[in-house]
Amino acid sequence: MSQILVELIKFANLIITMTKAVACGNRIQSVFAMQSSQTSGSRHPEETLRGQVEFRNAGITYGVAGAEALSGVSFLARSGQTVGIIGGTGSGKSTLVNLIPRFYDATQGQVLVDGVDVRELNLEELRRRIAVVPQKAVLFRGTIRSNLLWGREDATEEELQAALTVAQAMEIVQGKDQGLDAEVQQGGGNLSGGQRQRLTIARALIRQPEILILDDSASALDYATDARLRAAIGALPNPPTTFVVSQRAASIRHADWILVLDDGRVVGQGTHETLLEQCPVYQEIYHSQFRKEAHSHVS
């Protein structure tokens, strides 16, 4: 009798599990069936302006009656340049770079890539030219190799190693007995925060993008590793136009151009030296991270 009761309980649990599974499956299917509100353009980028990004009085307002998240942003990033973006929490740094691959569309002004408004470009081709490394490093269950190949499926062994070297991640592979075939747990649970970030950056570099967006993606790296990473990206034969979003002045001080954001507006732009002399917000950020007497423009 007790055995029958046990089996009935198992059967009841199975029914509950199946009911939940069907409900989850329906929700997933509704996501797959959802139509994007964005439309893809048909124009193609100008090949002579490879990687050039321009904002013309661009801004975005979330929702119909929402507050402006970004307003009046104008700057030009030429091919191969590095643009640093710095500001406090909620200042609009991530929102700004998310306009480039059209994760959001500007509600005012224009964002141009290679001389063409991103809304007029073929969306698939636009995103093929861009690699984004988000704030949270995302790794999947598998191996180091399988995670890197998400960047480009047909990447060769040499290309994988080259990307790892630039991302300062080769030592991770060399420290594993299985090398590139070493196990990676879901979410990179068996790796440190810095290791996860470096592997995620390597995956982006394998795409050989024209535009590279590092959205506070080196926050777990020490200053020396961060500096080597930036130098290695700049030394590539065809360096991408790189956007470095950071709250650390040390990570963006050597950028070709720096944007300082405060409450969704650009309150200063220029080189590190210029901003240190003329931009109060940048001065405050810099002096809060370094002693005042240390800003003798050491290169």
Each language-model region and where it sits:
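Cytosolic ends of transmembrane helices, especially the final helix of ABC transmembrane type-1 domains
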Residues: 4-31
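Conserved E/DxxT/N motif and adjacent residues on the DHp alpha2 helix
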Residues: 30, 37, 149
